[in-house]
């Protein structure tokens, strides 16, 4: 079984964690933006049937 030879430094660990968190932030921002545009009816990429 593969075992890491040296311990990862704290700074490298923080950098990787920050990158991982930033990806989640941008994904959630895009999802919120898409939901907002769908609810207001300004979306150009989705076709939503309006129940009247």
Swiss-Prot record:
One of its GO terms (cellular component) is plastid. It is found in: Plastid, Chloroplast. Pfam families: Ribosomal_L32p (PF01783). GO terms for biological process: translation. Its main location: plastid. One of its GO terms (molecular function) is mRNA binding. Keywords: Chloroplast, Plastid, Ribonucleoprotein, Ribosomal protein. Belongs to the bacterial ribosomal protein bL32 family. This is Large ribosomal subunit protein bL32c. It comes from Arabidopsis thaliana (Mouse-ear cress). The lineage of its organism: Eukaryota, Viridiplantae, Streptophyta, Embryophyta, Tracheophyta.
